[in-house]
Amino acid sequence: MGHRRLEVDGVSKRYGETVALDAMTFDVHAGEIFGFVGSNGAGKTTTMRIALGVLAADAGEVRWDGAPVTHRTRNRIGYMPEERGLYPRMRAGEQLEYLARLHGLSRSEASRATRQWTERLGVASRIGDEVQKLSLGNQQRVQLAAALVHDPEILVLDEPFSGLDPVAVDVMSQVLRDKADAGVPVIFSSHQLELVERLCDRVGIVRSGAMVACGAVGELRSGGAERILVDAPQAPPGWAAGLPGVTVVGDATGPTLLELAPGADDQAVLRAALATGPVREFARRLPSLTDLFRHVVSNEHTEHTEHVEDTGGTAA
């Protein structure tokens, strides 16, 4: 099972003049959590719908385990749509059993799986309630149960964490981790970048329908410009402004955050700081995923994919 992966290869989609996807390419390996981030309208949902076969691509292909995704494969995908797709007037438990049977489980298997997932997700006491009577957080939990109830081989989740309280986020995060550990490729989109940073093995940043950066979170972060946090309490304002290759990112009050151009001498920065008096802290700071995202999304000139590693796909 080690080599199984979901591949999105050169997928394009247009709506009239609007390019929704432009040769979108990436893959998600078995046992990996892949975070899909981008502004609204960047193409995340379109990509997911094409992967599911809900939408046809104009060009390119989606493969699972080396073969094009077919109706049979799609039956093995657990999907959580962004616009939640449960029947509002159906009881939560009946809804889950119905969906499980739709995916080929027997009545007793469907009932057992429904019990297992509603207990795991903390909504077992709600299975007799109509979906529309549940709180938003509990509707989310039932929606996740709907994606899991047929024991899928692949999980595709569109904004699964939106509207969840911190406890539910922890429960859902643990479920996704457990699924990945069991060898399932998990892909989810999210606007909560600190969550993506904490949870994902790899991240793809999408802009205007194309993948603009893709790689392990640590590699993407360390691939950014080097930053140094300097706490020199007696340093006058602007003490670092004239240093070669150094940009002051922030020093409103307290420690100064500096960005170093490639090849800039951090020891020269340290000497300049020591010349002002004591230095309490002098530490390298990696940019957060939020910083990277801002940089990539606002920087319209980086049109080429920065592939930090060989993901088996070609750069878009």
Per-region residue spans from a language model:
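ABC transporter nucleotide-binding domains
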Residues: 3-6, 13-207, 213
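Solvent-exposed beta-strand sheet faces enriched in polar/charged residues
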Residues: 9, 231, 283-285
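Short, flexible helix/strand-to-coil boundary loops that buttress conserved ligand/catalytic motifs
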Residues: 73, 221-224, 296
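Structural motif
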Residues: 84, 244-247, 277
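ABC transporter nucleotide-binding domain
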Residues: 171-260
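C-terminal coupling/interaction segments
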Residues: 261-316
